[in-house]
Amino acid sequence: FPRFDAGLEKFDGTPLYEVQDPAMAVHPMWGTMLYNYVSPMVKDFLISNAFFWLDEFHVDGFRMDDVDAMLYLDFGREAGQWTANLYSSNENLQAMEFLKHLNSIVKKQYPGILLIAQEDGLWPQLTDSVENDHLGFDYKWSGGWTKDLLSYLEAEPLDRRNYYDQLTLSMMYAYSEHYVLTLGKRDVGTLKEFLEKLPGSSRQKDAQLRAAYGYLMLHPGVKMTAPDGDVGPEMRAYLHDLNELYRNHPALYAMDGNSDGFEWIQFTSYDENVVAFLRKAEKP
């Protein structure tokens, strides 16, 4: 949580909400305070906040940012700047238990709520169940997929053969978690800003934009798009048609979590810059 005079830092003059150890209380990358997940009061406070949004505002779900900063004691810290847990490892055991408790109690009261983790530290099985002693998120935000696709798109066409693997890398791990794929404003900026990053003429930029959203919708994983108000009528119609295509073809979603629902046709076409694959639905 942020540090300012009217905030939670030393709320009553003592470290009430933050980690008790001064050396571990402030995150060195962002200068923010870290919650004390050992304290029952702090855990109740955080869970009450979640239920306030659920009860009063009827939100559809939560995306939890930087979950790796919660889970790893040494996240963003150099040697000597962090204290190991009782097993002499770098996992934040209290944060793990808090997330399990939060996710399980939210799901018990609101079974349809989506719980999404944004985590880049390769924590295993984020989206496996609490019953299996994992964290119980529904989905993991696939920032790696977005980053790889953008690095390919922003390259000059003649140089894209050197970035071709960025298009196919995601299928190496696509079934290790349940992923959310996104090309929203948070990832690419406004559509105008997105287009400015792409090479070529205005017509070529528009074609690449359509290809990017098409690849998003056809790739395994749950989709999230949030184009801004700059969307013109042609692009709006294209996105509408993509959504209709997705809804009307179960092969694009029915086996998202099963590798049997995907088959590569072409994934070594470096010079032509073509990828081809089959998406499959379960047999009737």
Summary of predicted features, one role per range:
Residues 1-90:
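Substrate-binding/active-site clefts of carbohydrate-active enzymes
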Residues 13, 227-228:
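Glycine-centered small-residue hotspots that permit tight backbone geometry or close packing
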Residues 36, 40-43, 230-241:
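A short, structured beta-strand-centered segment in the mid-to-C-terminal lobe
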Residues 45-48, 52, 211, 237, ...:
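A non-catalytic, amphipathic alpha-helix used as a structural packing/dimerization or gating element
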Residues 58-60, 75-227, 233, 247-283:
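Conserved alpha/beta catalytic core and glycan-binding cleft of carbohydrate-active enzymes
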Residues 152, 238-241, 245:
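Residues that form generic nucleotide/phosphate-binding pockets
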